């Protein structure tokens, strides 16, 4: 019946278990991977036949987190999981990126990978587990796949690399790096860091790749025991005669077209050449497949660009290999936003804004690993007009979510701590033109917009996208790649950071054989490019503005006695609601007695502070206050003495002679001097008019607690 095959191995501080043959036996392959109570069930289904006319590889990766994995019921209205969250989308991309290049060229059968998180230990992130599961399932499936891959997370604590750190360890770590690769080569890196050096980052990549070899070995052993027979798939034979005929018609013309430096002009010319070539060939032989001709033309394009770069000739737009496109940097471009910048690099342009809000604007993320609050939001929008196309405009696609997260990682390391700058900050990058490296333009624009908004970031940051063309032992690293160089090259390598170090590194490698030395050259060349861009940015704005925008809320902070919090909030929030309406401010109170008052108008903030100080003022026994009669009863009168405090003047304490009727001496609303005789344990205040009038000292207002005020 059920006959599971299991492999267990130690991976750093965790025990990993791979199990197959137990569940989902109708899928092409299925694996349950667990790492110290975090378990992910991964299935792979591949279609044996490709759809007719299919001209691209339809790989789909779905990653889904089930709340039952953490012993919870979904909080949504329907109490079930809905569309993928941003976190799920990012992990799906993390799985997709290293496995996609390992399918053979020409393989266009549909393949779907589904990773479902079924159990979660809050200390062990499921992303690495899911990547290992996808690698194992694809390797077991028999589908043409040049894997397996391994995956590792690397931390950097006390100047030491840590393999697969726990969530608690990650809080202490200066690095959060995920690396995936085959036995021979690194394929993907995704990381954020606290401005670490190039050597430290490269060391982490190499360390992670070395450590994950045990994963690859164990997957290979599992495949020997339980793997399905390899599919009998053969790449279609190359039609040499047809290739030569297409090259004769188009190669020289395409070579000339790729000397046109303007992107739109070049694309138009390339389209003309392709359509004329296909039309001429189909006229000669009607049986020819237009898709096949298109693929041959694409291969010729790729060869034209690559051979020119390898020969040391100028690039598509006429630049040398390490040249950056022309930069145009402007700040304060939108009058009413809190901070704005327009960053243009060649034909790539980002309009970036920064908006300041209060702590209640922070995003609450209800994640499988636990609830957390994010006070720095980064949103990236890529409208179709940025590449001169029409298209759907709506909720962000996977690519936009991924690029937004990368840009956020680039800026996160320089953001001020919440206790020093108590604002929620939202950065939005609108890509208005795109020809390569728009996510890195977003990093540069974000740094400028944050400075323009007066956010005290620790340093300016810039980002750069690098490319690589490699044939045999000959390789060239390209700085600031164009969109075409990204598609036609062998590596996409994005680095963001300040003058002092790297804040984010993302690598996607399409070929094997990228050595440590090549990565070192790319990182060093990226550093030079980054410093050049920072130099240009500093000419526009070299430090955060001294003050935040007049349109941004100013946050004033005062400290009150924690015992007085209930007085400021009032029954059912009545006092704080009334204060908010009366003063036109936003008031937030923390458990330690910190009160934050946010207002766009300084006078309103001062009014709110004054009112809170009145409410929280301590009443001093023996002190005389000016009061107002609020209620008259048979046995005396209640007098308000400021700050919402009220005390009783007993009938015997109204005058130094016998008082028959209170109203003979006091009227509602009458202002009278009163002396505090006693405050009992329940906070009730006894007052005396008689003793106050006997003493000649002037009346005092309630004394307020010391207030610390910052903006």
UniProtKB/Swiss-Prot annotation:
Reaction equation(s) it catalyzes:
RNA(n+1) + phosphate = RNA(n) + a ribonucleoside 5'-diphosphate
Q: Which residues form the S1 motif domain?
A: 622-690
Q: Does the keyword Magnesium apply?
A: yes
Q: Listed GO cellular component terms?
A: cytosol
Record-annotated residues binding Mg(2+)?
Answer: 486, 492
Map out region (Disordered) in residue numbers: 690-711
The compartments listed are:
Cytoplasm
Tell whether Magnesium is among the UniProt keywords.
Answer: yes
Compositional bias (Low complexity) at which positions? Answer: 694-711
Top-level taxon: Bacteria
Q: Which GO terms describe its biological process?
A: mRNA catabolic process; RNA processing
Write out the entry's keywords from A to Z.
Cytoplasm, Magnesium, Metal-binding, Nucleotidyltransferase, RNA-binding, Transferase
* Pfam families (UniProt xref): KH_1, PNPase, RNase_PH, RNase_PH_C, S1
**According to the UniProt entry, what is the EC number of this protein?**
2.7.7.8
Instruction: State any single GO MF term.
Output: polyribonucleotide nucleotidyltransferase activity
- InterPro entries from the entry? ExoRNase_PH_dom1, ExoRNase_PH_dom2, ExoRNase_PH_dom2_sf, KH_dom, KH_dom_type_1, KH_dom_type_1_sf, NA-bd_OB-fold, PNPase
What are the names of the required cofactors?
A: Mg(2+)
* Annotated ranges, domain KH: 553-612
Which family is this protein grouped under?
Belongs to the polyribonucleotide nucleotidyltransferase family.
Q: Tell me the PANTHER family matching this sequence.
A: POLYRIBONUCLEOTIDE NUCLEOTIDYLTRANSFERASE, POLYRIBONUCLEOTIDE NUCLEOTIDYLTRANSFERASE 1, MITOCHONDRIAL
Subunit: Component of the RNA degradosome, which is a multiprotein complex involved in RNA processing and mRNA degradation.
User: What's this chain's function?
Assistant: Involved in mRNA degradation. Catalyzes the phosphorolysis of single-stranded polyribonucleotides processively in the 3'- to 5'-direction.
Q: What is this protein called?
A: Polyribonucleotide nucleotidyltransferase
Q: Which organism is it from?
A: Citrobacter koseri (strain ATCC BAA-895 / CDC 4225-83 / SGSC4696)
Gene that specifies this protein: pnp
